[in-house]
């Protein structure tokens, strides 16, 4: 009824932007950092440039836009190359993403001031997040809209339960939704 907002209890958001971060991280793309982010543990990135790039997201690559900025500014890809990777992520084209991984790794290592072995180790962490993104990564605007809709559902569920459950049952997609909605209606 109110989307996947159970994780919000762990994060205790203070704004719609915090809600957006949680909503985006519970997608499959957040698998490798979800628990740390929900615990509000800032990610320790290997450079101040990456920290600055991801400062609004506790240091994590959360949105498609973060991935594009990372690919351009940290890995040296052009805007069109980064956008092609974003499209591959958006269309869940894992094969295209896999084909781009060597150039992302090489770009990261070339721009890193670290020795090659250290840079490769650092890059692999980000590559895992980008690979996870192929399962599904939200764009920032989509995440904000999703949160606002979820927030409104939660608001109506709490303050206007009759209207909420009526709307929920009228729009139920299957028998499980009807059964769950009816059980909730009896409970309230």
Please state what every model-predicted region is.
Residues 2-188:
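Noncatalytic, beta-rich nucleic-acid-contacting surfaces in large DNA/RNA-processing enzymes
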């Amino acid at each position: 009824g109110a989307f996947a907002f159970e994780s919000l209890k762990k994060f205790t958001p203070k704004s719609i932007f915090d809600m957006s971060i949680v909503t985006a991280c519970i997608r499959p793309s957040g698998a490798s950092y979800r628990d740390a982010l929900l615990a509000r543990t800032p990610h320790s990135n290997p450079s101040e440039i990456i920290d600055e790039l991801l400062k609004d997201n506790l240091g994590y690559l959360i949105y498609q836009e973060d991935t594009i900025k990372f690919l351009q500014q940290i890995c040296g890809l052009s805007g069109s190359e980064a956008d092609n990777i974003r499209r591959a992520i958006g269309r869940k084209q894992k094969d295209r993403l896999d084909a781009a991984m060597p150039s992302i790794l090489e770009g990261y290592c070339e721009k890193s001031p670290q020795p090659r072995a250290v840079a490769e180790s650092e890059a692999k962490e980000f590559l895992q997040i980008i690979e996870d993104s192929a399962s599904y990564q939200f764009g920032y605007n989509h995440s904000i809209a999703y949160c606002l809709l979820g927030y409104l559902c939660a608001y109506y569920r709490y303050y206007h339960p009759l209207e909420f459950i009526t709307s929920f049952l009228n729009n139920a997609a299957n028998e499980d939704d009807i059964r769950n909605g009816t059980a909730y209606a009896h409970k309230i």
